[in-house]
Amino acid sequence: MPNFASKTFAVLLGTACLVAPSVSMGSSFQVSCSDEAAETISDGMALLHNMMYIQAEERFNIAANMEPDCAMAQWGIALSNFHPLWPGTPSEAEMKRGQAAATQLATMTPGSAIESDMIAAASAFYAPGIEGYRARLASWANAQIETGAHHPDSVDAAAFAALARIAVAPRGPGRIQVLSDVGDTLDALHAK
């Protein structure tokens, strides 16, 4: 069995690279927006999967400007403004931008069941009445893991569910089993 450090590295690398630019979001699920906006969202999704949140937000903003009614553009903005594995918490400006996107999402109609579930997961982070970053992260993680379970054939949903499991994994010895399980899940996705 690999040691803890190598297993942790493998899981994080697998999560970051699961949906690389060569495997676009469009191959996992179709976005209910114009082709041009969908392509830009796919670029943003690839950046999100590689934890390039600042660059991803730029792509999602471009898509939102192209097509203001595209819910997945706002989803991307909301998701880009918290960073589950980065140290620290979102800045006040990031929280404001993410909350504004989540507020906008509440007025929009998703185009499919998976869009609805992905939007619900991102919005769970910004839900009213949740105090503190760890509680917000747990709210998002629970919803994101559920989304992954509801859409087992979606590489994107599975990758974000894996990220969610890592983000809320317990500290200490229990973390090893979570990381191992996530690694097994990602290995199975790569085998498809």
Go through each PLM region and give its residues.
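Short coil/linker segments at helix-helix boundaries
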Residues: S24-D153, A158-K192
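Bacterial N-terminal signal peptides that target proteins for export
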Residues: P2-L12
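N-terminal signal peptide c-region/cleavage motif recognized by signal peptidases
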Residues: V19-P21
